[in-house]
Amino acid sequence: MKVTARLTWIEEKILEKLLGNASLTLLYQSSAHKNCVSEMTQKYSLQGSTMTVFHLEKDVVVGVFILENFPRLVSEKPCTCAWFSLKRNNSSGISALFLNTKVIVDSEELIIFSLDGLSLSVTPLRGFTLALNDTVMNGLELNLGHGFLPVECEIFRVDGIKKNPSFIKKMVTAEQHRGKLLSALRAYKPYKDLVSEVRILLVGPVGSGKSSFFNSVKSAFQGHLTRQAIVGSDESSITKQYRVYSIKDGKSGETLPFMLCDSMGLEEGEEAGLCIDDIPHILQGCVPDRYQFNPCEPMKPKHSPHAASPPLKDRIHCVAFVLHINSVNTLSDKMVAKLKKIRKDVVDCGIGYVALLTNVEEYDEVLDDSFANMTETVTSLSQVQNVQKWLNIPIANILMVSNYASERRLEPMKDILVFAALRQMLRAADDALEDLPLEDTGNLAPF
């Protein structure tokens, strides 16, 4: 008879994402197989990477992933282990730890040691008693006591995973780093409160992912996927209007102190796509939200009530040059010339700028294990070198993301890249605000 896993489909997907898009195959279930260690080890020993899951009362799931083969007896060689806990009915409530451990197996008990002592012990013959030490309990944010009875124990084989301890550690700690970035962005305030909200202009060729980046930012803050901005794959720009999007924090509901300004896509033709003569007006804050672009007729300042002297709050404070990473090396000379012209306008206005490369496929390999810097492999890419040369921009301001497209749920590594890119844009904006001449800082009101 086929045994059905107690893990829900959503819980399986969360755990698979935790390990970098792995797949789970059920090997053992305590209610369907014998409650003894020998039966357990017979099912999962020498099966490769495994995940042992304990279903507890109060809708809590606790488990441990072991990268190496699970031994039949005492293992003196440390194993790469990731510990996790899930709270049912809370799809984002996952906590995880990365520990090097040793495994002891005998006829009555399964014990997993970490360097600080006993971490987990399982005794099926005593009614499947499970015990976790304080280190694991605190790290997994559990308050269950030291000895408790699991409702069910399941063991899964884990396939499609990279056999690399560093990669596993990176995947396991990604959620924690995502939380740190999110907290930092929630606490962000523009430099010396010169403006209440920083404005970031997204500019780039048609199909580069400008609107998709806004959708990705909004999704990451909301905690679920959303697609407010219309996106598409037409050869001409889907975005016809100038849009100023505010971002709300999904937790507090408050509007965050930054806006993303979406523009029409650039095209090679002189009377197609965003007219680059419109750029200075946008940068200076002379263009209202929902202004309809006309590629054949450059913008006139009369469209804005602040055209004579727009307040600082209406101006652009950072520009993000958005480029599809797979199209960078095939950009025409005309398109590169347009990007250089826009960069000159940005510099002349004293505005900070970054480059944002989208549609990165191996997005989990962009940042190093500490999530602090891009890897050397990434910074040496020809696309990065070309963008650096064209825009005369430091490597630190060349950012990479993989926008959400067809996914149905958020991924920590994608969110990390989105948050890291946004953080660098805000830093560039703050640098520009700090460098403003006194006469400009005096033109602040109205907020």
Swiss-Prot record:
InterPro entries: P-loop_NTPase (IPR027417), TLDc_dom (IPR006571). It is found in: Cytoplasm. Expressed on cells of the hematopoietic lineage. Detected in transformed cell lines of the macrophage and B-cell lineage. Expressed in spleen and bone marrow. Coiled coil: none annotated. SUPFAM superfamilies: P-loop containing nucleoside triphosphate hydrolases. Disruption phenotype: Deletion mutants result in elevated respiratory syncycial virus/RSV infection in vitro. It comes from the Eukaryota. Its main location: cytoplasm. Keywords: Cytoplasm. GO terms for cellular component: cytoplasm. One of its GO terms (biological process) is cellular response to virus. Residues 1-159 form the TLDc domain. Induction: By respiratory syncytial virus/RSV. HA-28 antigen is expressed after induction by inflammatory cytokines. PANTHER family: INTERFERON-INDUCED PROTEIN 44, INTERFERON-INDUCED PROTEIN 44-LIKE. Type I interferon-stimulated gene (ISG) that plays a critical role in antiviral and antibacterial activity. During bacterial infection, promotes macrophage differentiation and facilitates inflammatory cytokine secretion. Plays a role in the control of respiratory syncycial virus/RSV infection, reducing the ability of the virus to replicate. Acts as a feedback regulator of IFN responses by negatively regulating IKBKB kinase activity through interaction with FKBP5. Precursor of the histocompatibility antigen HA-28 in BALB.B mice. More generally, minor histocompatibility antigens refer to immunogenic peptide which, when complexed with MHC, can generate an immune response after recognition by specific T-cells. The peptides are derived from polymorphic intracellular proteins, which are cleaved by normal pathways of antigen processing. The binding of these peptides to MHC molecules and its expression on the cell surface can stimulate T-cell responses and thereby trigger graft rejection or graft-versus-host disease (GVHD). Belongs to the IFI44 family. HA-28 antigen forms a complex with Kb MHC in BALB.B donor cells. Interacts with FKBP5; this interaction modulates IKBKB and IKBKE kinase activities. This is Interferon-induced protein 44-like. It comes from Mus musculus (Mouse).
